[in-house]
Regions:
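A general "terminal functional-core" signal
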Residues: 1-199
């Protein structure tokens, strides 16, 4: 419900965020990887079925591949799935997104942002009319389940890049939190707040 509401607010106001969501491993037939229901998939179907969007982009920057979304939408040309994730992390067997970018272990800020900019330029050639952004902070260097080495500032730069890229094009934008398993709970909250503050 939260991501459906957030997507409706994004249609009305241009940008919104759900302070949860991003359960991108759940599929039609059940949950997986700490994800019970795939909120982004439900919200995307809601928008499409009501004619509120015609071409949706899912930008998934969680450290884990968004295999649930890639499976759910693999035959749906109205939804484009983009996942940039750790090559060696969960799930062991990856699904095929419309665009997958696999990152090597221990990747740091500069290479991460450079890679993201490159693929954003490709995505900007398409005519999307709605964007979901899964802003997992498990790319952080201190995350228990991540394998990348992205700093606090790197996460802030990532979120700024994504929000500014689509907001400047006046494409309705809905952000959700995604994964985060930092050993320090207060740090985890601060990292997730990056998206909220920027939006």
């Amino acid at each position: 419900g939260g991501t459906v509401l957030a997507s409706k607010l994004a249609i009305n106001y241009g940008i919104s965020c759900n302070t949860a969501g991003g359960s991108h491993h759940a599929n039609y037939n059940g949950g997986a990887g700490y994800c019970v229901f795939n909120d982004v998939a439900v919200a995307a179907h809601y928008l499409l079925n009501r004619g509120l969007a015609n071409k949706i982009l899912i930008v998934d920057l969680d450290v884990h591949q968004g295999n649930g979304n890639s499976e759910i939408f693999k035959e749906n040309r109205s939804v484009f799935t983009f996942s940039m994730h750790s090559k060696t992390n969960y799930p062991a067997k990856k699904s095929n997104s419309d665009l997958d970018v696999e990152l090597e272990d221990n990747l740091e800020d500069d290479a991460y942002i450079k890679t993201l900019k490159h693929y954003l330029n490709e995505l900007n050639q398409e005519n999307f009319d709605f964007v979901f952004y899964i802003a997992g902070v498990d790319i952080h260097f201190n995350d228990r389940l991540g394998k990348l080495k992205i700093s606090d500032e790197g996460i802030k730069s990532r979120d700024e890049l994504i929000v500014e890229n689509f907001f400047s094009k006046r494409i309705p934008f809905c952000g959700v939190l995604g994964g985060g398993y930092n050993k320090d709970f207060n740090k985890l909250v601060k990292l997730h707040l990056s998206l909220i503050h920027i939006s």
